[in-house]
Each structure stands twice: as structure tokens, then as C-alpha cells.
Amino acid sequence: MHLSDEKVQKLLFILILILGIGARLWMFGDVPGGINQDEAFAAREAWSLLHYGKDSFGYSYPMYLTAWGSGMNALNTYLMMPFIALFGMHTWVFRLPQMLIGILSLFAIEEIVSKVSDWKCSLLAMFLLAVGPWHIMLSRWALECNLVVGFLLFGLLFFIYGMEKQPFFILSAVFYGLSLYCYAAVWPIVPIIILLQGLYLLYVHKTKITKYIIIAILTFIVFTIPVILFYLVNMDILPEIVTPWFSVPRLIYFRSSDVSALDIPEKFTALLQLLLTEKDDCYWNSTAEFGLYYKYGLVFTVTGLAVCVKQIWKSLKDRTYHGYTFFMIQFLLAVVLGMLIHVNVNRINCIHTWVLIFMAIGIDQYIRLFKKLFPHVDVVITALYLVAFISFEHFYFTTYADNISQYFKKGIEPAVLYAESQRDAGQSIHVGDSFNYSQILVFSTITPDEYKASVEYTNYPAAFLDISQCQNYIFHSYPTGENGIYLLYGLSEEDKANYEQQGYQITIFDTVSVLEKQKENLQEISLYQIFH
């Protein structure tokens, strides 16, 4: 039976969606095992804001978190709050916003490309995002800056919708405005993205300035006001703003030089190297084995880029609309950003979506060129990516899962809760050097006031603060034969034997061990039981 193009399109859309959702949901919360220090701090602040209306530094509903001392983007924390309210403090809960945004991005990229090309190219773009290692990996854990990938897509989607129904421009402004709270590095480029996209539409007579566009502009300006205030506060031009409903904090250390025009040639070279090698030194971002988009894909990207340049040149010369211009604006401004910062995969996350879209356009072009000579060229290319995807998935859930658990300290959540359950009133829990303090405190119930009153820093002031003690936790501390509870990472069999000879009972949670002296009358009702 011959299926119509419409039915084939729907069937392929469903299959790609199932593939993409499955890759993001399978063993969600378990792989990557453990918790990264950034997602831990974001979750810690979400819990504090949810229950006490302020973060660990005492700021009520800040537009930017103080966190490590040099700050952290806040939107991810606010998105975690309703899920924490519903499901409690668990690693899989912290990762829900990123996973959901990742899945919604599959819908968004297909819809965006379908508006500027045909359905085959749009499904190719969706497919590449669905099976691509970069996007699968970022969707499965909660690094706050990676939210910007989805919000920039949503902003563009509703911008394109706005050409047909102008009220959508307002929704586009909302998502572009929210992107400012996903990742501070995009602050310089998002207003320029909106400006260039708007000027282009006016240039090709695709829109006129109406009340909806004015409202959209004002909406975006409202989102930028806290950002401007934040900059003025941290440049010591204004005092910090603290109210019961909203705060603009003065950071302990303001990294104003993170985005700068210094060393542009070196930064551009680093960006090119990142895109060509498809990896950085961060195992949670990419792997040497599979890269970001599978190693052979960049050939298609270059082709797609050339196709777009040709179409955009014609569009500008004839003053006729072509949606490829939007992709080029976003891509070129991401390149500009890459020349202003020291890149790694997540710092330049705003570039990868457009690389994949150019890749889809390039593949579509090759299929059109060779379809008559090789009728099954589309099947061959699809099979090539599916084989790579299956290989990546096997690697991700076996070798990668084992390796990443060493970085994220798999077992840390149950280990901390167990240690709390074994602790007597007033007793301290000692933590070894291998952990970041946020990985521990995220599973504690230390209130913001208790945190401020008890925290002792080892390097204050600094961009990345470290602490020696907070409430009942003592960090950088190891067993010396005394009674107590200790959290240690990666004990060898020899280590275990030595500690057991000293009288410690050892309870193992994957990579994390809890050591305790045998004591009588241990507490029966525990945080471990409450959380579980």
C-alpha cells in the first residue's frame, strides 16, 4: 500500500519523537549517576526559596543567585521549585525541567525548519537533534546554562509565528527575555538577535510596526531591566536592591571580564577547534568517541551553511524573505560570543542547534543531488546515523555511565541521607576532599538562616568559594580513629580494611562510603526515611 506524503510525514514524526523521548527518559535520574555540583547548588537554592522565600545568602527571590560567590543563573532554580514541591528532594526531580525543555525542543526545531523549508528537511533537523549525543547528554542532567538552548529555540519559533499572527511576537519576547535568566553569557547577543531579526523583516517588507510589536519590544525591555540593574549594582554604581519580593544581589566576586574583547584570535581558534574536534575537556559535555553530532556530520554542516549563504544573499539583494536568514543571525552572533569568551561545549551552547540545522539542510541538499543516481541515498544516510545512535546509546549506558559516576559521585544522595539518619543530635558529619560542599548540602535540611550563621569559608572572598564547615558538616576531614560519621569517596579494599581495623563500620553506596563508629541507641526516625 502506497502511503501519502502526509501520512509518511506523520509516521516519521512519531517515530523520531519516540526515539528522542526514549533516549532522554530511559534510566532518567540514574544516568548520569550522582549529582554535579552546579545542579546541586541550583537545587539547594530552589529548596531554600520554596520553603523560606530566600536563597542561602538571604536574598529574597533574586534575579541572579550568589551561589559560589561569583553567581549562578537563576531560571533553572525557579523551574525546579514546583517539581520539588510535588516530588521532594531527589536528583531525578532536579533534572525534570531540563529534560522537559529538551523534549519540547524536538517539537520546536521541527516546526521552525518546516516554516522555512519542506517537511523532509524539518524532520531531518528533528532527527539530528533527537539522536545527537550533545543534546541527549544535556537533556539528562541539570546544568542551568543549558536551558538557554531551548529558550532561544522557543523565542525564534514564536518570532516566526509572529509573521502570520503578530500577537505571537509578544510570546517570542517572553522567551527571549527568559533566555537572559538561563545564561548570563548571552546577555550581549540576545538583544542584537531580536534587533537584526526585526530589521530584516522590515527590510523585506514582511511585517509592519503595529501595537503588537510595540508591546513585544516593551515586554523584552521589562525582562532586561533586572539585568541592567544587576550590572549597575555589581559595578558599584547602585547599591544592591533587596526587597521581600525581589532582589538584585551584589556578588562576592563579579566576573566582569568573562566576556571581553581581549585575545579574540586565540578565542576564535579555540572555538574552531571545539567545533572541528567536537569535544572539550569536560566529560559531562562530550565524549572523544562520539563527539557532539557524530564525527562525520560537519561535512554536511559546511554544505548547509553554503546553501544558506546563497539563499540569504539572494534574499538581501532582491529584498525577498527567506527564513534561513534567522538561522544565520543566530549562528553568527554565537560565533561572535565565542570570540568574546573562553569556550567549552556548554559555554558556547547557543551555537550547536544552528550547526545541526545547517547539517540537516546539507543532508537534504545531498539527497536532492544524488536521489536519481542513488535512489536510496536517504535510507543510507539515515541508517548511518541510526547505527551511530545505537552505538552511542550502548556506550552511554555502559562505559560512560561507569565513568561519569566517578565525576558526579554516584551514591551521594542515599549516602548523605543515611549519614543524617545515623547522626545523633549535635553530632557532626565529616566529609572528605573529593566532594564539593553543594553535593552534600543539597540533601540536608539546613535553612538559609542556619547556613548564613554557621558557614565558614576557606577562601573568602573568591569567585568560587570553598567551605570548611556548615552547621553539623565538617569538610576536608578524614577519620582519625575517633568516634564520628564520615563521608568518603572511592575507597580501595585496602582502605576499607584499614578503617575496619580502626573500628569503623562501613556502609557503601556505589562510589560513596559512610564510615561510623559502632554506637548504641542510634536515632530511629531519620531524614533518610523521611525522604524515601
Please tell me what each predicted stretch does:
Residues 42-49, 246-251, 406-419:
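Short extracytoplasmic/periplasmic juxtamembrane "stem" segments immediately C-terminal to an N-terminal membrane anchor
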Residues 221-270:
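Transmembrane catalytic cores of multi-pass membrane glycosyltransferases
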Residues 359, 437-438, 494-496:
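Short, well-ordered alpha-helical microsegments
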Residues 422-434, 482-489:
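Short hydrophobic beta-strand segments
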Residues 455-532:
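Aromatic/acidic, Gly/Pro-rich catalytic loop(s) in extracytoplasmic/lumenal soluble domains
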